[in-house]
């Protein structure tokens, strides 16, 4: 399985022949919705596949720079850390999206928004948990 990554998390594609051919993408999120980024897959022992990603759930359109001198319109690395799941190996994804609760760290509390807006960076590759 592979994810098509752009700012909308277009979908997952499946291959059953080791990557020689791929099925059509299955959307994880609604096309044209808010930014979703930095997705990573996890296959659990039960067979359930999770996709974890950043989501601009509050539809923030611009942010202040760390020194408050500039307005920045790149908004794909902020918001909420969320997940959806698939019980059919990526043929479909849960309707429900789940926010992952986390505690604020000093870097969150010290950002220009005092932790009311969080910034994320998630880089990874798919993995299987046995």
PLM features per residue range, with description:
Residues 1-130:
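Asp-box/BNR beta-propeller blade signature and adjacent active/binding-site loops
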């Amino acid at each position: 399985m592979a994810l098509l990554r752009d700012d909308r998390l277009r979908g997952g594609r499946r291959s059953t022949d080791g990557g020689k051919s791929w099925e059509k993408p299955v959307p994880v999120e609604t096309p044209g919705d808010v930014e979703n980024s930095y997705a990573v897959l996890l296959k659990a022992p039960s067979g359930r596949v999770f996709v974890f990603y950043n989501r601009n759930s509050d539809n923030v359109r611009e942010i202040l720079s760390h020194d408050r001198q500039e307005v920045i319109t790149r908004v794909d690395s902020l918001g909420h850390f969320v997940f959806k799941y698939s019980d059919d190996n990526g043929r479909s994804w849960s309707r429900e999206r789940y926010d992952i609760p986390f505690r604020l760290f000093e870097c969150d509390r010290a950002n220009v928004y005092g932790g009311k807006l969080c910034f994320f960076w998630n880089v990874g590759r798919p993995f299987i948990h046995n």
